[in-house]
Amino acid sequence: MSYLHAIILGIVEGITEFLPISSTGHMIIASSMMGIEDSSFTKAFEVIIQFGAIMSVLVLYWKRFLPHWGFYRKLFVAFLPTAIIGFVVKDVVEHLMGSVQVVAWSLIIGGVILIWADKAFAHLTMMGRKTDDLTYKDSVKLGLFQAIAMIPGVSRSGATIMGGLTLGMNKKEAAEFSFFLAVPTMAAATLYKLLKIYKTIEPAQINLLLVGCAVAFVVAMIAIKFFIGIVSRYGFRGFGYYRIVLGLVILILLYTGHDLQMV
């Protein structure tokens, strides 16, 4: 992996982390198209640079993270299902992260669900439930929705937003809670990956991680503002159509003999 690769992946991550189109799926596709080797470092890189994007949430929403123990407890409860399920199925997830075909099907199925949800929950206006209205039981449900996103291509933000909508949150509140839940989730995922590779990581690879995280952070700052504005005005339907088209294009390329698998 070169610095140019790290910058491109950082841009891809920053743009896609908070959109319901799967940042991991897009990075797997981008890595495949650039011919980046499918190594343990590459897989770790694709997870760790997500923390760079997540840091933008702390900057943009810092007031929400001031001492507010009820808020922290709900975030922790929502995080637990993902942590537990992730630990149990981590090897399966590692294997799936190398499959562009899995990403393609996840994009298509997720796109169909997004389009359905945009219509089914269109009645939820700004009067919907707020984050402070969530119960601990609601938090567990949101955590279970997030756990589904361990399948590459599903989209963590898309899954948690969907969970928020089913609980009666409006689109803006559901999207913002998805941002907040990303902080402990990706912090834990980053720590786990660092512990796995810290003994073998080389100085040059550390620099690649820093570059990727920095780029993802800056780009994500812009993407969050864009996403909230789009969702508030137009909903999720456009993202759903995008997912379906991208997934179909990938499948067509695969089934016509184009090798998109990581090398």
Swiss-Prot record:
Keywords tagged on the record: Antibiotic resistance, Cell inner membrane, Cell membrane, Cell shape, Cell wall biogenesis/degradation, Hydrolase, Membrane, Peptidoglycan synthesis, Transmembrane, Transmembrane helix
Listed EC numbers: 3.6.1.27
HAMAP family for the chain: Undec_diphosphatase
Note: Bacitracin is thought to be involved in the inhibition of peptidoglycan synthesis by sequestering undecaprenyl diphosphate, thereby reducing the pool of lipid carrier available.
InterPro entries: UppP
A single cellular component GO annotation: plasma membrane
UniProt key word Cell membrane: yes
Similarity-based family: Belongs to the UppP family.
Catalytic activity: di-trans,octa-cis-undecaprenyl diphosphate + H2O = di-trans,octa-cis-undecaprenyl phosphate + phosphate + H(+)
Coiled coil regions, renumbered to chain: none
Predominant localisation class: membrane
A biological process term (GO) from this entry: regulation of cell shape
Cell location: Cell inner membrane
Gene Ontology MF terms: undecaprenyl-diphosphatase activity
First-tier enzyme category under EC: hydrolase
TM stretches of this protein: 1-21, 41-61, 69-89, 96-116, 147-167, 177-197, 208-228, 238-258
Gene giving rise to this polypeptide: uppP
Any matching Pfam family: BacA
Species of origin: Bdellovibrio bacteriovorus (strain ATCC 15356 / DSM 50701 / NCIMB 9529 / HD100)
Official protein name in the record: Undecaprenyl-diphosphatase
UniProt KW Cell membrane keyword: yes
Signal peptide positions (record): none
UniProt membrane topology term: Multi-pass membrane protein
Record's function text: Catalyzes the dephosphorylation of undecaprenyl diphosphate (UPP). Confers resistance to bacitracin.
